Amino acid sequence: ADREIDLNGDLLMPAFKNAHTHSAMTFGRSFSDDLPLQSWLYDKIFPLEAKLTAEDIYHLSRLAFLEYLESGISACFDMYYFPEAMAKAAVDAGFRTVMCGAVNNFKESPALLEEYYNTYNNYHPLVSYQLGFHAEYTTNRSIMEAIAALAEKYKAPVYMHASETESEVQDCMGRYGMTPTALFEQLGLWNYGGSAFHSVWVSNEDLDIYKKHGVY
């Protein structure tokens, strides 16, 4: 070898990458963690998130980034609010972040998503931004259609939560007569790929859709 490093029994390897994070949610550790997802979100988390400021997000995100680095993680794919605070926290920590839109019925908008996309893909070498929204059950059809139009405009992938619980899938079937996965495909959200975070309750047909569009 051209170079040898004596690690005294330790391992030298490439850093880990965390592919789905909500870094600023360091505030929610062990908070009502005995509840079903929907109750936890609507009764506990969403009310708290409504009170968070950009300054809060900066400090909460920076705490997470420092912990990631300590754990051997050098980059994350982060879905949350106040990207200006998230981006600054990442740069200040020397951490690589790919931010993702978190649009829903009560926070952010497709217009703001497009603004963020153009701003934070030209912000700093450690920062980039992808199109995204929270989930089918928090985002109405018109918003999803507008995001699909952005995906087509920029030839960009789209990221969201999908099929995390059985009730989420059943409720979507009641609203649209199809699974979240089938709906997202119908709307053209994955014409350029993307991801469906969690995907616990998926059918074989859903998996075929993922394979077709390179969704992971």
Regions found by a protein language model. Name each.
Residues P47-A50, F133, Y192, G214-Y216:
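Short, basic, glycine/proline-bearing loop/turn elements
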Residues A85-S203:
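Metal-coordinating catalytic core of metallo-dependent amide/deamination hydrolases
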Residues A1-M13:
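Histidine-rich, glycine-flanked metal-binding segment
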Residues P14-T26, P157-E166:
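Histidine-centered catalytic micro-motifs
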Residues R29-G94, E114-Y123:
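Alpha-helical scaffold segments that flank or form the walls of functional sites
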Residues V202-E205, Y210-Y216:
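A conserved active-site cap/scaffold subdomain adjacent to cofactor or substrate pockets
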Residues L7-N8, L60-S61, M79, H134, ...:
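Fold-independent oxyanion-binding glycine-rich loops
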Residues R3-I5, K17, V98:
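Hydrophobic/aromatic beta-strand patches that form the interior of the parallel beta-sheet core
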